[in-house]
Amino acid sequence: MRHREQLMAGAKQCLEERGYARTTSRDIAAAANAPLGTINYHYASKEALLNAALLEMLQEWGDKVRAQSAAGRRVESMWERVVESEATDRPLLVASAEALAQAERFPEIRQQIAEAFERSRTEMAADLHGIDATDSAEDKKLARAVGSVHMALVAGLTQQWLIDPEHAPSAREVAVGLRRIAEDLDPSGA
C-alpha cells in the first residue's frame, strides 16, 4: 500500500478511535505507519485528509442504510437500518457531528460537506422513492425536497441517539410520526 492509501486508512482508523476533533497529524501518521510530512504532500492538510476520509466513510454508511428493500417497505426499512446503525456506527456519527461544527470556521470543509449533502439528497430520493432528478426540472426539485426531508430526519435522529439513546425514537416511532405528519399535511383531509 502506498502512503496515500495508508494515510486514508490511518485517518479512518483515527476517526473511529479518536473522533474528528481529537485527531492530530501525528495520530494519523502513526496509524498509517507513514512519515508525518506525507499528509501535507498528499492531502495539503490534516483537515483535508480527515474530510476526505469522513466523507468516504459517510458515503459507505449511506449506501448501507439505503440498501434496497422490497417495494412498499423501502422507507421504513431504511429507517430501521438507520436506527440500528446509530448504535453500531456511533464513532462515525460522533466524528461527523464534530466535522459539522468545524464547517463554520473552515470554508473548504463547509464546501465539501455541502457537495456531499447535495449528492445525498438525490440518492435518497432515487433509492427510496424512485425519483430521478435527471428526468425533468420538476423531478429535480421534487428529489431535492424529498431528499432534504430525509436528511433532516437523519440529522435529528442522530442527534437524539448521540445525546440520549435510551429515549431516542425507534424506526417504528419514526414511521408512525411521519404518517401522522403526512396526514396533517394532506390538504384534502383524506
Locate predicted features.
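Helix-turn-helix
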Residues: 6, 10-48, 52
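Amphipathic alpha-helical segments used for helix-helix packing
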Residues: 87-114
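Hydrophobic/aromatic-rich alpha-helical bundle segments in the mid-to-C-terminal region
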Residues: 109-114, 131-190
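Short, basic, alpha-helical segments at the C-terminal edge of helix-turn-helix-like DNA-binding modules
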Residues: 55-60
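Hydrophobic alpha-helical connector segments
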Residues: 48, 52, 63-93, 139-150, ...
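Short, solvent-exposed amphipathic helices
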Residues: 112-123
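Solvent-exposed, amphipathic alpha-helical segments
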Residues: 10-17, 64, 95, 99, ...
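Short, Lys/Arg-enriched anionic-surface-contact patches
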Residues: 2-3
